[in-house]
Amino acid sequence: MRIERLYEVVRAPHISEKSTLAAEERNEVVFKVAVDARKAEIRQAVEQLFDVKVRDVRTVKMKGKRKRFGRLEGKRPDWKKAYVTLEEGNEIDFLGGAE
């Protein structure tokens, strides 16, 4: 896979209370990924970008929220997130040990 596609597939880490608990309890990392990305592509991208071994990938398509600005109504775009379970002994630290 080309390096450009790797960065298109894995867009950003998704940091939330739920994803932090998943990282601590189940060695899972949550990413925002491209809507057209397949599980095999996500696995390959994470393994190559972060130099870790992936055990499992689960994906969820998220609906964009409806938003209003005065009388104008709009909708945020739909997006996809991936729960990536890492093999034992592998970890990705996005916060750099910040307390």
Swiss-Prot record:
Entry GO CC: ribonucleoprotein complex; ribosome
Nucleus recorded as keyword: no
GO BP field: translation
Keywords: Ribonucleoprotein, Ribosomal protein, RNA-binding, rRNA-binding
Protein's UniProt keywords contain Ribonucleoprotein: yes
GO MF annotation terms: rRNA binding; structural constituent of ribosome
Family the entry assigns: Belongs to the universal ribosomal protein uL23 family.
Subunit (UniProt): Part of the 50S ribosomal subunit. Contacts protein L29, and trigger factor when it is bound to the ribosome.
Task of the protein: One of the early assembly proteins it binds 23S rRNA. One of the proteins that surrounds the polypeptide exit tunnel on the outside of the ribosome. Forms the main docking site for trigger factor binding to the ribosome.
HAMAP family for the chain: Ribosomal_uL23_B
Name of this protein: Large ribosomal subunit protein uL23
Organism of this sequence: Alkalilimnicola ehrlichii (strain ATCC BAA-1101 / DSM 17681 / MLHE-1)
Highest classification ranks of the organism: Bacteria, Pseudomonadati, Pseudomonadota, Gammaproteobacteria, Chromatiales
Gene this protein is translated from: rplW
